[in-house]
Amino acid sequence: MRDYDEVTAFLGEWGPFQRLIFFLLSASIIPNGFNGMSIVFLAGTPEHRCLVPHTVNLSSAWRNHSIPLETKDGRQVPQSCRRYRLATIANFSALGLEPGRDVDLEQLEQENCLDGWEYNKDVFLSTIVTEWDLVCKDDWKAPLTTSLFFVGVLMGSFISGQLSDRFGRKNVLFLTMGMQTGFSFLQLFSVNFEMFTVLFVLVGMGQISNYVAAFVLGTEILSKSIRIIFATLGVCIFYAFGFMVLPLFAYFIRDWRMLLLALTVPGVLCGALWWFIPESPRWLISQGRVKEAEVIIRKAAKFNGIVAPSTIFDPSELQDLNSKKPQSHHIYDLVRTRNIRIITIMSIILWLTISVGYFGLSLDTPNLHGDIYVNCFLLAAVEVPAYVLAWLLLQHLPRRYSISAALFLGGSVLLFIQLVPSELFYLSTALVMVGKFGITSAYSMVYVYTAELYPTVVRNMGVGVSSTASRLGSILSPYFVYLGAYDRFLPYILMGSLTILTAILTLFFPESFGAPLPDTIDQMLRVKGIKQWQIQSQTRTQKDGGESPTVLKSTAF
């Protein structure tokens, strides 16, 4: 029986129809790029200090010395969360005493910012941090907002596949596109931090569901030779384009509500794609809607200037296709044998670490020296060559060496940052860009690599579990950035160390480059070291007079 690709081979590989679908589905991902990272500017924390009300009767000298100083990055700056007790310094001011000359400031009693804060408006006019005072004792709320967004992404990744299988790829694509745009718009009317955060969780659910639906729809419509390019370059590069657009919007629109309003406009415009993007013929056939699938295929043929055959799907082939029942497998199968259990655990570690590094560096933009808008643009732009490099490596070089090298590059430069003198801050920023380049390349390659490691019977499940680990990494990443408030090098030390350890771990994965995809668990490639363990086990068994087990051949380390 012919498969779907053989049946539709008459359409060609790269005709006008395929090019249109490739571009439109990739373009639908652009809003995902700036919605996911918009929190960098929506929750930006400007320099701030305790507010000293104008109603307090202070001399100009005491008003200028009302905030204690602290040493930060080798210079004296006003503290952000403390001030001298106003009642005390008001009395000194009334008595005509001068700060520093008549009064030792180090001996003065201090207090919290009881009247709120005043914020520097050179970078941001307004953010959710300045509007709801998410600083000092409430500074944990901003990273929590980001983490909960990724919790929404995690929930969306669970339900998106089921919704897509039940209601169709196209319907779910545009439903979740509307969900992402609609809830982003509703965030404009947030009256408090809690309302904003709940809506942001729903935006996260829509974002990942939209991404998955577009990804699946493209892989099902496009031909075999185009699918890999679509998966590694198409959606990824257009996501990076969306990320690159974000700082351009944010530079010209520095009020968080107006910025959010501007970011919803492209999502609304994407709604017009409904009339150009078809449903997946594969999904229609799986639902028994063969005539609808044929209509789409014939329109594609006409668009490509090709005459479709009179009969596209043979009734007997469809009957054979519908009679095939997939064998049931459970998540337990991912740990059923020693080999697949080790691969699953290693994959979870690999995905989690890469995700922490990718999102941690993306969210760390405000902490970099230099202009935040330029730095954000560069962190987004560096993803484009990273994706191109990943695609080239996947075409020509072994997987585990490629991923390990990319991770080692990313991790090592992050560790070097702490050695850079403070006056060479541009070098530190450049090292962060190189680190983002390496980790992004690994992120792009790990999707293909994981799919090649798992057998057909549990491939979707294996990639799904690994992807879930990635979501957990993204949830943790804001708190890696948060540690920079205590030591600006600590996030880089942690992310760099984890990335290098994972690069070493990757070398123990089996090599799938050039190997046929396994169909069963027994056909899986062996983890490095498993063969030696089996040989030792066989020797012990033979000494005991038992039957020697079969040793599967593995690729040499």
UniProtKB/Swiss-Prot annotation:
GO CC term, one of those recorded: basolateral plasma membrane
Protein residues bound to ATP: G218, T219, E220, I221, L222, S223, K224, S225
Regulation: Inhibited by emetine, quinidine and verapamil. The IC(50) of emetine is 4.2 uM. Not inhibited by valproic acid. Transport of (R)-carnitine is stimulated by cholesterol in the plasma membrane.
Pfam families: Sugar_tr
Cytoplasmic side: 1-20, 164-172, 219-232, 279-341, 395-406, 452-462, 510-557
Chief location category: membrane
CDD domains with a match to the protein in the record: MFS_SLC22A4_5_OCTN1_2 (cd17376)
Alphabetic keyword roster: ATP-binding, Cell membrane, Glycoprotein, Ion transport, Membrane, Nucleotide-binding, Phosphoprotein, Sodium, Sodium transport, Symport, Transmembrane, Transmembrane helix, Transport
Gene Ontology biological-process entries: (R)-carnitine transmembrane transport; (R)-carnitine transport; adult heart development; carnitine metabolic process; carnitine transmembrane transport; carnitine transport; establishment of localization in cell; liver regeneration
InterPro entries linked to this entry: MFS_dom (IPR020846), MFS_sugar_transport-like (IPR005828), MFS_trans_sf (IPR036259), Orgcat_transp/SVOP (IPR004749), S22A4/5 (IPR045915), Sugar_transporter_CS (IPR005829)
Modified residues (Phosphoserine): S548
UniProt superkingdom: Eukaryota
Residue numbers spanned by region Disordered: 537-557
Places the protein is found: Cell membrane; Apical cell membrane; Basal cell membrane
Keyword Phosphoprotein on entry: yes
Residues carrying sugar: N57, N64, N91
Keyword Nucleotide-binding listed: yes
Membrane topology: Multi-pass membrane protein
Transmembrane segments: 21-41, 143-163, 173-193, 198-218, 233-253, 258-278, 342-362, 374-394, 407-427, 431-451, 463-483, 489-509
Cystines in this chain: none
Role: Sodium-ion dependent, high affinity carnitine transporter. Involved in the active cellular uptake of carnitine. Transports one sodium ion with one molecule of carnitine. Also transports organic cations such as tetraethylammonium (TEA) without the involvement of sodium. Also relative uptake activity ratio of carnitine to TEA is 11.3. May also contribute to regulate the transport of organic compounds in testis across the blood-testis-barrier.
Protein name stated in the entry: Organic cation/carnitine transporter 2
